[in-house]
């Protein structure tokens, strides 16, 4: 990566601004999944071990109006982070003003401060999300000219707390998490060890058109599963019953199939049910066609075997999107089968592109078997699509 990293700058005695991704799920004020906090620890620990004063910025959820602030404070995150670091985390509970400035100026070397949810600034004119120039300058002024971006999950957004701060500091550098994310995903797509197999699931073709097009050029095989299977089926005149379909994307699906030169591999059967919820019958289809009055909710056993075969000998695998409605035990066999087929390949570099796939690997007990699980769904999708990420582009060149 041709950008400066946190190891390229002197941090001792400096107020170091750090964009992290602490957008964690909360239920009744309790964090239900702390992976993103854990993922940021190496960078935070490095800064404080080097004698820097870490000033952390993160968003949490969407905030459009005053009422949306309810339950979106980063206070529970500050407490969790303090426990993980084994030291106090200063939390003034504001995004600007004298209280914040005084707390920052009182910091000593090796201390950590967490600014309140950056999206609280969206209540008055979307200042964070629209990269308000004044806000970016203000936040940049709170530090000593060094900004560390370690939030891969928001790297595809141009916000005040990443791109805005970057534009107003002497040095904007990558943290360890951002550096690793870019290295794993970009290298897998641009310079993969072959055979390189991509697996794309999820419900909508529309979400993955750019990704499929880019990966058809780069990968040796592209396996398709999940709900978008049925748009590809219908584009070929295959009966899909009541399965999910994007009627306005049938031509796109047809076009992708025609120009794929046989690289695009579709399921050959499905697990179908007579309703999405409250179903009374679940069965495997004979072939591709889904029965009238039924809908496909997972790939079937023949497809699992076909995908297993397609993955044999793979040296690089990128997976984004589950094969079915994995949250329901009746429709998780496809996702489990594909995961197991990936991780059993000897010497494979296996990467999960965040989002639902990451949740599936964690929930189904396979997370530790993968080489890398991305912390950013949208950002990893844009990298897989070959796009430039604004948060990365804004960093200082080496």
From Swiss-Prot:
Pfam family, one: PGK
Catalysed reactions listed for this entry: (2R)-3-phosphoglycerate + ATP = (2R)-3-phospho-glyceroyl phosphate + ADP
GO terms, biological process: gluconeogenesis; glycolytic process
Major localization listed first in the record, in broad terms: cytoplasm
UniProt keywords, alphabetically: ATP-binding, Cytoplasm, Glycolysis, Kinase, Nucleotide-binding, Transferase
Pathways per UniProt: Carbohydrate degradation; glycolysis; pyruvate from D-glyceraldehyde 3-phosphate: step 2/5
One MF annotation (Gene Ontology) recorded for this entry: ADP binding
Cell compartment(s), UniProt: Cytoplasm
This enzyme's EC code(s): 2.7.2.3
PROSITE patterns in UniProt: PGLYCERATE_KINASE
GO cellular component: cytosol
Binding site for ATP: 208, 296, 327, 354-357
InterPro entries recorded: Phosphoglycerate_kinase, Phosphoglycerate_kinase_CS, Phosphoglycerate_kinase_N, Phosphoglycerate_kinase_sf
Binding-site residues for substrate, renumbered to this chain: 21-23, 36, 59-62, 119, 157
This protein's record includes keyword Ion transport: no
Quaternary organization: Monomer.
Protein family (similarity comment): Belongs to the phosphoglycerate kinase family.
Name assigned to this protein: Phosphoglycerate kinase
Organism of provenance: Streptococcus agalactiae serotype V (strain ATCC BAA-611 / 2603 V/R)
Classification lineage: Bacteria, Bacillati, Bacillota, Bacilli, Lactobacillales
